[in-house]
């Protein structure tokens, strides 16, 4: 059956290739282990204008490779497209000790595509192993990694940018700007990759990331003495990123960037003029940013529709920004603030802000069927309008309560809230605290803008307003009220804008709501 499968697959691939393309079949014997092989591995160099296709008939493992030449690698392409057709085999690189551009695969010609497709397991670990290495995959053309069961990039280094994948656009080049497309892979991991430039894991002009299973960018790091950003991913000036989660969750956690000895958490950095084209997840899936997004100043403001539908396919999942994974000493504004300088519309599903984060946008609006959830201490900050249709606030604790904030900064900006729903954590042991024996009030929500006329508050609702604990130890109900405050000076003598505050009051020993 395996022989028949290989024959049919290879025949189909062969028919799809240009007539003059070079086809190379790879067997287990094409692997290499420098720990037991005294002979140096000769680079596989291709230069066919019509393209080269490597078709796998067996698993191929390449490990413990050491090259003394500065420009050496394992696979080097100098002309035409380069295809690696996996045929459900394993293809792994491990412990590559080389300093060439792209220790594993180097595609050195623009306006081409490097494709790795249909593998059971595709892995680049410590490839390269050395800090002076220059990344696992380097391509002047576009890179496509697709339809594989498991794809892993772990522990790779680059003395330039993008320790896992780097697709630079060379100044003066007449080639089109390269892109990276990661699509249809069922398990995708980028972990512990380190670069000395932009993008700890990936640096490219355009990135399309479409996941079909659990995926993560974890503990990647970018550092430089002068200029560094994009702990996991860096998007070049004028570029774009599109994220679509079709199954499972996509998680960004523990990614950092350092400059001048200062280390901050960062998942994705958009350089000047770069933009999100899509940010979406299907129902019961999500994108979780435990590290912030950063965005260089942009003179052109573009639209971003979060959870935008695609034809008949809807996206009703969760896009989450959270400070949950920060250690106590890491809690600061830089590690909690995500910036996307675009006009954002929430089309469906849930946008969640939790654990003290701030989300800074150019403007925000949402469709009525979508939900914005904010936990105490979080902020939605917009230069322009902040038009919120449906806000949910979950109360877990009333001690040291910090209000939710929605703020618009421009002089003509508007803050509007159509519906506010306040819910309480499902456990009731909280009511055993002594403060519930007496009435108290906490500031729940602050709307801040240029004037009273710019702050519009609509319907407010409470879940479980009536509370009765076991043995009637605590009885009472919650209520909402609001007040307006003119501009003032805070304790640091900074101007606080016009404010409308919604208060949450606990009323004890009441047997029925008034």
Swiss-Prot record:
Keywords: Cell outer membrane, Cell wall, Membrane, Secreted, Signal
SUPFAM superfamilies listed in its UniProt record: Pectin lyase-like
Membrane topology, record value: Peripheral membrane protein
Cleaved signal peptide residues: 1-21
Organism: Chlamydia pneumoniae (Chlamydophila pneumoniae)
Full protein name: Probable outer membrane protein pmp12
GO CC terms of this entry: cell outer membrane; extracellular region
UniProt similarity note: Belongs to the PMP outer membrane protein family.
Phylogenetic classification of the source organism: Bacteria, Pseudomonadati, Chlamydiota, Chlamydiia, Chlamydiales
Main subcellular location of this protein, as a coarse class: secreted
Subcellular location: Secreted, Cell wall; Cell outer membrane
NCBIfam families in the record: POMP_repeat (TIGR01376)
Family annotation (InterPro entries): Pectin_lyase_fold/virulence (IPR011050), Polymorphic_membr_middle (IPR011427), POMP_repeat (IPR003368)
